[in-house]
Amino acid sequence: MFGAGTIGIAAAIGLKHFGCNEVMICDHSDFRLEKAKALGFATCNNSREDLKESAMAVFGAAPSRFGSTANASIYIDAAGAEPILELYQSMGKIESRMVVVAVRAGKRPVDVLEMTYSQHALIGSGGYNPEDVEDVIAVMVQKKWDIESIITDEFSQEQISQAIERAADVDHALNVVIRY
């Protein structure tokens, strides 16, 4: 999972809920990674740790076109940083897939030849179906994860400017709620 924000952590919880044994979340914010770790996820600060080595320690090894890599089948981009797609293409195992959740303005380059040789799949994700909402409710009712722990701040509607500023501070905030 690329991105330890609200969407990344929620997607990681979904992966665990639907049966993934191991889920690793990577981000550049130690604050957010600590929140993810407290929820039981393996973490990697890929701004200073070797992501491939960390992932191999969690998932084991698998073949790729470029040698041994992490035995991870699913990658999710919940961060939207420009190099993520290229990073996936360089380290994704054969027949792995990348789901893009984070929206980034403009076009993103894809090496279609590499995608073909590695048998990678690139999947877009947008919107919800009624059954998705039912799944989210089931996860919340289950109370297996302390989902409320990702709420770091609450503001009144009159404090919306401060709330937006706080939400942009990834080293001190994760999920900022505005009460109205």
List PLM regions with ranges.
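Mid-domain Rossmann-like dinucleotide-binding core that forms the NAD(H)/NADP(H) cofactor-binding site
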Residues: 1-49
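Structured loop/turn residues at beta-strand edges in well-structured enzyme cores
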Residues: 18, 70, 74, 145, ...
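Structural detector of well-ordered beta-strand residues that form the stable sheet scaffold
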Residues: 24, 97-99, 123, 177
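Residues in the short beta-alpha loop(s) of Rossmann-like NAD(P)-binding domains
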Residues: 28-29, 104, 128
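Glycine-rich cofactor phosphate-binding loops and adjacent beta1-alpha1 units
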Residues: 34, 39-121
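C-terminal hydrophobic helical "lid"/dimerization subdomain
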Residues: 86-90, 130-180
